[in-house]
Amino acid sequence: MKQIVTVTLNHICPMVTGVTPHVGGPIIGPGCPGVLVDGTPVSLMGDACVCCGPPDMIAQGYPGVMVDGIPVVVQNCMTAHGGVISAGVPGVVIGSATPIKPITMNIRKIPFPKIRTVDSVGAAVTGNSKKMKEAKNNIAELKKETSGQTPMIYNLRWETEGVRLYSDRIDEGTKMVADVTNIPDGDTVKISVLIDEDNRIVKQFEGTVKNGTVEIDWDILSKHFKKEE
């Protein structure tokens, strides 16, 4: 069982830039404002964290619970800098009898830090070599996870000119967009649109993966979703 993580909780970052250890900092979200624990939004995979230098990003999530198609964050999920979220909200846990591994974002979407020679030297000079090694090992583990996990399509949404739609109104020019994990760029994915309890297929779409995302022109207007008598 894992504790659910919310925005404002801290992550711990072992990365070192120059002679400055990152230490870590709070998750700044955006999280999901519509799903709250103790009045605070739950954190989602891809959320940003305060860290030394550029913000860090949560690169993992729990595939068994999704909000708006995005996995929620639980304790021990890792970040792009090689950090980890060591604890969530006490008493708010999810999981099953059989442990489920977290999923990792597409490697193209993870902003891994560039580790320079001066950073390794700075870590040694300041006595932070052990922390730097931990960060490197965690980053290597993230990269390994992205190639070894089951292919997955998630975060399916509709967009118009790059803006996510939350309305049930479907106009021309709308695109169906989804993120993928462990599906190489250039591969074709198929998405079936279902409409009712009988799983009637309205249409099957095909799209090509590019930069860890598939984008498809949505040519089904609202009239297609009226149930046939």
Give residue spans per PLM region:
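Intrinsically disordered, low-complexity proline/glycine-rich segments
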Residues: 1-149
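Core beta-strand residues in small-molecule sensory/regulatory alpha/beta domains
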Residues: 36, 66, 157-159, 194
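Short, compositionally biased P/S/T/A/G/V-rich stretches that sit at domain boundaries
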Residues: 147-170
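Structural beta-strand segments of beta-rich domains
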Residues: 172-176
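Exposed aromatic-hydrophobic patches
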Residues: 177, 213-228
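Short solvent-exposed strand-capping/beta-turn motif centered on an Asx-Ser/Thr pair
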Residues: 179-185
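Solvent-exposed serine/threonine-rich low-complexity stretches and specific carbohydrate-binding patches
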Residues: 200-220
